[in-house]
Amino acid sequence: MAERDARHLSRRIRLTTPHWNVTIADSDGLIIGRPDAWFDDVGLAWEIDSKAFHYGPRDYERTLARNSRYAAAGILVVQTLPTRLRDSPEAVARELKKAHRAAAAHPRPPVRVVEPI
């Protein structure tokens, strides 16, 4: 449900078309993450992080480690709760647009998609 809402929102706001659920690696080939949406043109990751899958003790540790890998690689990340996507899509749209502009204002991080797009 949340990913369907995210896809609908991304089409509606007309940013570059994101790639969905692709694996991102750094220049050494080390896996950084698998964002729900990846805006390859600017190196922006969008994660739809539900409490059910990210806030158990081990899940939370993995989420923090993932976010640290994104930061170390220079990737800007937008994190959205599914409930916020459902209840406040306009606010989420504004955040995505601003984040896309912010990412575009900097050199694209030296990362690549390691799965076919």
Task: Kindly give the residue locations of the regions a language model identified.
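Surface segments flanking catalytic/ligand-binding clefts of nucleic-acid enzymes
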Residues: 1-117
